[in-house]
Every structure is written in structure tokens, then in C-alpha cells.
A protein has these predicted regions:
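Conserved beta-strand in the GNAT
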Residues: 52, 58-67, 85
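Conserved GNAT acetyl-CoA-binding A-motif
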Residues: 107-119
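Conserved acetyl-CoA-binding loop-helix of GNAT-fold acetyltransferases
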Residues: 86, 92-105, 132
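A conserved beta-turn-beta hairpin within the catalytic core of GNAT-like acetyltransferases
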Residues: 70-81, 91, 138
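A short helix-loop-beta-strand connector motif used in the catalytic cores of GNAT acetyltransferases and
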Residues: 40-52, 80
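Conserved GNAT-fold acetyl-CoA-binding loop/helix
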Residues: 17-41
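A short beta-loop-alpha structural element at the N-terminal edge
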Residues: 4-16
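Conserved active-site alpha-helix within GNAT-family acetyltransferase domains
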Residues: 97, 109, 121-139, 144
Length: 147
């Protein structure tokens, strides 16, 4: 399967929402107006790049990359990687690898000293995948949900 990785654009919004519904099936679907406003805020946020994987004209995966300025590590930024998702029918075909390799390239281009991602502790297959790409479990993560 041939996959093209590219920055997402507004026209990808329906496909992105479909991917996110696979990632978090219990989340309510956002209303179209709010989704569009949110996308436009994401699109204009400094340091933010949402990448999509496209195959045969279909968006089959995505990753959300945010490069954050940093006053430590010689002022080198770091990249926060979020919302890594590939359509179920396209998993284990190299799409996720291509997305994270593109994120890695972007991190290097922006001088990041690290890429950081969190994954629910129950997602063992995802953990094995991330480790196959060089990610290591070296810290304990915490979340505080606000609602």
C-alpha cells in the first residue's frame, strides 16, 4: 500500500473526526460548527502540525505534533505527540510507522531534543509498536482530567 504523509487541512476535518471516533469511541461527536472553529484554532497555533496519512485518496491515519519552546536543554524545544490513530482496516500495514517517522523528521527539523507521548497503560500492542520505533518507557506519566 502506498501512503503519502502530509499536513492536514480543513478539508480533512470529517476524516479526522472519524479517526478520533475510533480512538475514543465513547466521546460525543462535536457539532460541526464547534469542530470547525476548533480546527481553525489548531491550524493557526504556533508549533502545531497535524499530519495525515493518505492512501488512494482516503485519509487512513493521523498524528498531532506540537513543538513546544523550552528554557532547559540549551533552549531546545520538545515535541508532544498526541492522537496517533490509524483506521482499523489499515493497521499493521506501515501507516503508523510512516506517520511517526514523519513526526520524527519534523522534530529533528525543529531542533527538538525529545519527542514525548503518552499511551493508556492498557494499550500493550501500541506500546510494543512505539518501542519498535525507539520510544522507551523512562518516566511515569500523570493526568488530571478537569471534568
Amino acid at each position: 500500500m502506498t501512503v503519502t504523509i502530509r499536513p492536514a487541512h480543513e478539508g480533512d476535518l470529517p476524516a479526522l473526526l472519524g479517526l478520533y471516533a475510533e480512538l475514543h469511541p465513547s466521546d460525543p461527536a462535536p457539532d460541526p460548527h464547534t469542530a470547525l472553529e476548533t480546527w481553525r484554532a489548531i491550524e493557526t497555533q504556533a508549533g502545531r502540525t497535524v499530519l495525515v496519512a493518505e492512501s488512494r485518496g482516503l485519509v487512513v491515519g493521523t498524528v498531532d505534533c506540537t513543538t513546544l519552546p523550552n528554557l532547559t536543554r540549551g533552549t531546545r524545544p520538545f515535541m508532544l505527540v498526541e492522537n496517533v490513530v490509524v483506521l482499523a482496516a489499515h493497521r499493521r500495514s506501515g501507516v503508523g510507522r510512516a506517520l511517526l517517522e514523519a513526526a520524527h523528521t519534523l522534530a529533528r527539523q525543529t531542533r527538538c531534543y525529545k519527542m514525548q507521548l503518552l499511551s493508556r497503560s492498557s494499550r500493550k500492542a501500541a506500546h510494543a509498536f512505539y518501542e519498535s520505533l525507539g520510544f522507551r518507557t523512562i518516566a511515569q506519566g500523570y493526568r488530571l482530567y478537569l471534568d
